[in-house]
């Protein structure tokens, strides 16, 4: 019998439905292509909570772009039966209204009910992204249910915030399909800018929280800042709705504790996807530098995802990029699909013995761009408890003499290869080589890496 799982998705990854059970979010293309319907949709979304209630996690968009369905497929191969709304004999999915706060009482009650539904069996919490903040709010509200939790498996947890939320609120993302723009940047910013959970995702108050390496936001004076404390960046016409949301987020979540407690957790952190590395708050604006792949998983900075700590917290870094058997990068939304995660799922869900985690992936863009001067290889090597492997050295066998990459007490390393001089050896346009990992007491040999070459 599979271990029971309670799944808490991220933001904005839950459906919103009306009183008839019809899905309002995500909207259909027709809802956004017709101007009158678009205005009605946006107005309805801004009326919070209005007549909308949370539905299940979004399985897919238009039946094409998999969301939670990609996770459900993986769990299905491991014996889990999951219905259309995300329930099953050993599985409960808790959709939540992401327009409200991460600690909204109805959401927390739904999480608690999901745990109780499996009693006396202990549950595994599978949490993704903003779901980490929902989970912490649940623990604070229901400490009596901590004994009902067997393990926490987190993917890309936004434990200490993310700049992606700040970008979405301030500048906004546009949405299009087949080249037809459905939402403009301003419409996207207006939609997300009215949601409390977006402000809950801003990095917290540096004066009240031990940010560690999370010094992502600075004010005009150059000092660490929180967008929920320094409100100078908010555009004047947005202040009427943005200030109350920022004030609420700061009051509730401005002070955060890095200590997770004694619960056992496997905390999966990705790096290798374009992620905002910093933000500068100036008058009525936010300055973002270029996205950087070495800062996170494409949405959440690794410094935030790895910020949480505790005596039983095992933090595992996985490189995001092109693997030999899986060249499509598994960014933030689909981290569980990474080949590097297969071992983790077996350990947590199937009680497989823990073994050291080693992995290497080529940068997904450089791996296929024949004109790029370099190919970046991201490597990770960690012991069974997530700590660095002792005296670990990776030997990249790319020529007559292997290239050593010493980890020097770290869990992550980067190898950059100049593309010139490499010629295809695995197919008509692919160069393949292997990496041997050696450490005190063990080794992992012939880890394959590949990229395009002439």
Task: State each model region's role.
Residues 1-186, 298, 302, 306-307, ...:
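N-terminal non-catalytic accessory region
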Residues 11, 271-273, 296:
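Acidic beta-to-alpha connecting loop that harbors the catalytic carboxylate
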Residues 89-92, 96-102, 199-289:
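Alpha/beta-hydrolase fold catalytic core
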Residues 151-154, 158-234, 266-267:
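Extended catalytic-interface subdomain
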Residues 281-309:
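Low-complexity, glycine/alanine/valine/leucine- and proline-rich hydrophobic stretches
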């Amino acid at each position: 019998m599979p271990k029971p799982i309670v799944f808490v998705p991220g933001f904005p990854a839950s459906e919103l439905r009306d009183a008839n059970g019809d899905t309002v979010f995500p909207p259909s293309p027709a809802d956004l292509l017709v101007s009158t319907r678009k205005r009605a949709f946006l107005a309805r979304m801004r009326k919070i909570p209005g007549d909308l209630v949370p539905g299940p996690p979004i399985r897919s968009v238009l039946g094409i772009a998999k969301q939670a369905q990609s996770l459900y497929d993986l769990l299905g191969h491991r014996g889990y039966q999951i219905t259309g709304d995300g329930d099953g004999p050993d599985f409960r999915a808790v959709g939540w209204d992401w327009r409200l706060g991460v600690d909204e009482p109805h959401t927390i009650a739904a999480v608690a009910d999901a745990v109780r539904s499996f009693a006396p069996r202990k549950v595994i919490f599978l949490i993704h992204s903003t779901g980490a903040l929902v989970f912490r709010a649940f623990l604070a509200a229901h400490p009596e249910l901590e004994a009902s939790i067997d393990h926490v498996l987190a993917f890309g947890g936004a434990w200490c915030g993310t700049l992606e939320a700040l970008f979405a609120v301030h500048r906004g993302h546009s949405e299009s399909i087949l080249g037809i723009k459905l939402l403009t940047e301003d419409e996207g910013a207006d939609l997300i800018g009215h949601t409390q959970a977006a402000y809950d995702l801003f990095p917290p108050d540096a004066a009240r929280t031990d940010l560690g390496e999370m010094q992502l936001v600075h004010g005009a004076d150059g000092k660490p800042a929180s967008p929920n404390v320094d409100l100078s960046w908010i555009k004047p016409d947005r202040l009427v709705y943005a200030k109350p949301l920022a004030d609420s987020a700061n009051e509730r979540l401005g002070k955060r504790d890095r200590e997770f407690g004694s619960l056992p957790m496997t905390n999966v952190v990705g790096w290798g996807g374009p992620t905002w590395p910093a933000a500068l708050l100036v008058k009525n604006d936010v300055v973002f530098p270029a996205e950087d792949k070495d800062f996170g998983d494409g949405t959440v900075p690794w410094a935030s995802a790895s910020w949480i700590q505790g005596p039983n917290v095992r933090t595992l870094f996985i490189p995001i990029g092109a693997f030999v058997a899986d060249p499509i990068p598994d960014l933030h939304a689909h981290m569980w699909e990474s080949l590097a995660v297969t071992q983790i799922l077996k350990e947590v869900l199937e009680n497989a013995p823990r073994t050291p985690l080693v992995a290497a992936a080529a940068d997904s863009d450089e791996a296929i761009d024949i004109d790029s001067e370099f190919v970046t290889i991201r490597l990770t090597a960690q012991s069974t408890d997530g700590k660095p492997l002792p005296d670990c050295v990776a030997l990249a066998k790319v020529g007559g003499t292997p290239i050593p990459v010493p980890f020097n007490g770290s869990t992550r390393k980067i190898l950059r290869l100049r593309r010139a001089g490499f010629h295809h050896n695995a197919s008509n346009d692919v160069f393949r080589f292997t990496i041997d990992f050696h450490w005190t007491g063990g080794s992992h040999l012939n880890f394959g890496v590949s990229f395009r070459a002439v």
